[in-house]
Amino acid sequence: MVPEGEGSGTEPVSPFYIPATGTVSTQRPHVLKWDDSFAVLDPFGNIHRAATGEGVFFEDTRYLSRLVLRISGRPPLLLSSALDETNTFVSADLTNPDLIDGGRILLAKDTLHILAETRLGPDGFEQTFALTNFGPGDVDLPLDILFDADFADMFEVRGTVRRRRGSTGPTRRSRED
């Protein structure tokens, strides 16, 4: 909720208000393993493009090289994250950061709870999201899931350079939107 006197979209933010805009996690990455597949995720359940070794791999090839959740273009805040004892399921509790525009709070931190659950198993890799609104009214904002695939060999991900590699073509859609 917005602190008393702190704008809920109608009042300006106090000069003493410290907005919650990001989370720094000191947790180690989560590694999911199933048969010839494995996934390396950050504690949020994200996969970043940077040379972190994160991704979803099958038979030594990285298929998914990016999977990132954004709320109004911003990363969520991490509340907690846990890997189950089978190393096939990770659960991350997330919330929204303060969304501020023009000195006014559009959505106060902790208004939304996001449960991000990620599974790796016989049916493949799956990530689901459940959102709960703890605010007094409806919330209308963009929720983006950014993803990419590079089909990199596991050794390339670790830093080995190939002499030749195929090129990435333009994105094609199977149907008109």
Model-based region annotation:
Residues 1-177:
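Terminal accessory carbohydrate-recognition/targeting modules of carbohydrate-active enzymes
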